[in-house]
Amino acid sequence: MSSSPELGGVDFFAHGGLPVPQVTILQAERVAALFGLTVQAQPLGSQQDSNFLLADGGSVLGVLKIANPAFSAAEIEAQDAAAAHIAAACPDLRVATATHGPAEVPVDGGRALARVLRFLPGGTLAGAGRYLSPRVVAGLGAVAGQVSLALSSFEHPGLDRVLQWDLRHALRVVDALAGHVRDEDLRDRVTAAARAAWNRVEPLAGRLPWQAVHGDVTDDNVVCLLERGLRTPDGIIDFGDLTSSWAVGELAVAITSVLRHAGAEPCSVLPAVRAFHDLRPLSAAEAAALWPLVVLRAAVLVVSGEQQAAIDGVNDYVTGALEHERRLFERAMSVPAEVMTGLILAELGLAGEPLPTPSGVVVDLGRCAVLDLSAQSDAVDEGAWLEPGLEDRLAQALLAEGYDAVATRFGEARLTASRVLADHSPATVATGIDLWTAAPVEFPAGLTVTGEGNRVHVSLPVPDAPAVPPLVRPEYAKGWLALVADPAPLLGLPTATRPDEGDLLKRRAASFAAVQEHYYADPPRIERGWRHHLAATDGRVYLDMVNNVAVLGHSHPRVEAAVARQLRRLNTNSRFNYASVVEFSERLAGLLPAPLDTVFLVNSGSEAVDLALRLALVATGHQDVVAVREAYHGWTYASDAVSTSTADNPNALATRPPWVHAVDAPNSYRGRYRGSEAVRYSADAVLLIGELAGRGRPPAAFLAEPYYGNAGGMPLPDGYLAAVYAEVRRHGGLAIADEIQVGYGRLGRWFWGFEQQGVVPDVVTVAKATGNGYPLGAVVTSRAIAERYRDAGYFFSSTGGSPVASVVGLTVLDVIQDEGLQANAARVGAHLKARLEELAVRHALIGAVHGSGLYLGVEFVRDRGTLEPATEETMAICDRMLELGVIIQPTSDRMCVLKIKPPLCLDVAGADFFADALDRVLAEGW
């Protein structure tokens, strides 16, 4: 089996089209037999070669690659040598090296070289309907960087070839093949885009380093390690496009492939660019050439796909890719190359000097007011930012006050330009200044002025810049703002300063204890809330599905007014005699059944649980407590001692003091007893309490959430609390219901969680919802139990029950009643749960939907039989949901449950937006 004697490299322009060699499955199996392999062959898609997966029973032995007859022996040898070279240089990178061959074999139309390559399990990133996360995109860039570094020292005669995929020839390829594009409009746009991109690359060409390049480090050829539900790029296959070309082309080809994926847009490639740059630093010239090369690659893919389909119409791999290539091209063209280049340079720290600040006032505006439209502006309070025409009304009001002009701020992210329930960021960042003037103003040449009437937009673009819109999306702001200068100095206004949002996280890490964690690795900066929405400083508005603290909704005007009014009058400690503490205590006790009639007021849930336990210890004289596993109750010594959730404290079980005794979490979905067997949980708890009493250690209390909140809102088994409460009371103990998460109407049907169980506890703890974000908690018990606390001394909390805290508590109860929030929780919660249960029918990852009202949980499992928790997938889903405009977080000890605890003002539109976003994520990936 000798190699082909032909040594010259292929020349695409001489060969024209390269149809895939027609090889049947039987022929492929016969070729494999030449290498001593008895296998079953399965065809794989390819653009120019004929590929087959070779298997022996259930074992994959390799991939048979029969090269296009146009490729010489030297080219094939170079490919195998390059693969071996990379494998040696990058031991952590899996590489499809040759295991057998090459050998010359007959094919339809001539003879070709065949060999068997190592099979890399795990699958590729391919699939245009599949979403690629920033982590995966960065992994793609890292693979491209590793390959580029390794090949920088590789040389071989077989690199001397002229390929249509070599970006040095991109414009020539487009010109040669554009005639195959039947859609005239598309053809014209592709050729124009290629010409414009080439005009940007050509002046840089002399500064772009050459080397050996793989040429096809794309989603089709990067293989992933699949571990714990997540993909990590760690392998490379298919060296068929190996050649010598611009080194930066390796990255351009890689990131172009990202654009065909679900949800991708130009800024989606930045993690790959950064990862590549970290391994193989790009020069400023390479960074400047990168996006034009992406456009050229996209244009080549479109024309090549159309040409290949024309000459190889039976190739499903080719014809199926046409629509994806067109979509990829449209996305590459959706942002001007100048903007993407500026964005890339800024991301890599390669941007040149900022545009010079213009000097000298050229327009005298007189007395001018500056209008703040950011998320932190008082002008957008109480949801005013959602009102159409707010900017004009604010400006006209200032003009009416006597100002000669009103101006907005350059580079500011305007909350007034945002919108709610949006799956992508709107254009919020100003590229100029809007002006309202009391009298007409003459503007000199050099300023770009648009608009009519007494409102105009003034900008100062650089020469030859593309048309700059007045507002741009925050993801692209650095690119757009590199094309415009701040016109403020020319208008006699102060120059705007743009904060570095990353600096805030650094300052937090330096001054704020790191154990006080924040949501998300790269969190948005949230500075405003309204109802069930949270607004970031870049103008993006998120649907808040996790913030059960703001039970009424964020920034409720009645709470704000009540606090301000009371602060103007009095705020002191609860030892003084004032009405609000009495009124709130009466109202709260009035919501509970007898004999729960006496209230203690504290500042938090942790304090409430701590006090409840102290009450039980003093009232009973007992020293032990029974608590439920996988629960969280607080951070004080006592409340932490009974917190058994390993998600909140990995050492919770090992460090539990001897006076705390844990019973199994009554989880009817994945616990020891499931379904109808779940009634046995209460028997086990009763047995433990009896055993403790038999050893002379009867418990002072049994503490549990009456609705299993930490598991994602799961009801306890029927009769569970009735049986356990009866047993603990039989031995002189108290029943404590922790309502901090689940109470206050959140469950919809029941105001208190214990109502679902048909029981009355001896002590109830509440917090979170009681203050709608203001620090307020309470313990409610009977007069007899409360009086026993005197045996341990007196109780006092400086700000617990303060005038302001008490007024807040009263206002929250008023709003819950006046706005029908419990009924809303029942209605919207039922709608949302039905939507989620419908998703569970279509998406196997959803194992169960738990909960009631607006305390719901979606539990993700990898297998509905074994219930293996999908922990990593859940966190990745939360990250993707954030990108789509939803704030959601995981819960449970396995961190595989989405905890759905939004403000009770959530409406059906918000519920549907959440369900639709989750459906999209589960369909497209995370």
Which functions belong to the PLM regions below?
Residues 127-186, 208-210, 623-641, 645-652:
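A cross-family kinase active-site recognition segment
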Residues 44-58, 63-64, 98, 198-249:
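Active-site acidic catalytic loop and adjacent metal/ATP-binding pocket
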Residues 496-926:
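Conserved N-terminal phosphate-binding loop of PLP-dependent enzymes in the Aspartate aminotransferase
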Residues 247-281, 295-313:
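Active-site activation/catalytic loop segments of kinase-like enzymes and analogous catalytic loops
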Residues 344-440, 464-499:
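Polar/charged, compositionally biased leader and regulatory segments
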Residues 21-32, 153-156, 172-215, 225-228, ...:
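An alpha-helical support segment within catalytic cores of ATP-dependent transferases
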Residues 66-110, 128, 134-138:
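A conserved alpha-helical element in kinase catalytic cores
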Residues 177-180, 301-353:
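ATP/Mg2+ or Mg2+-diphosphate-binding catalytic cores
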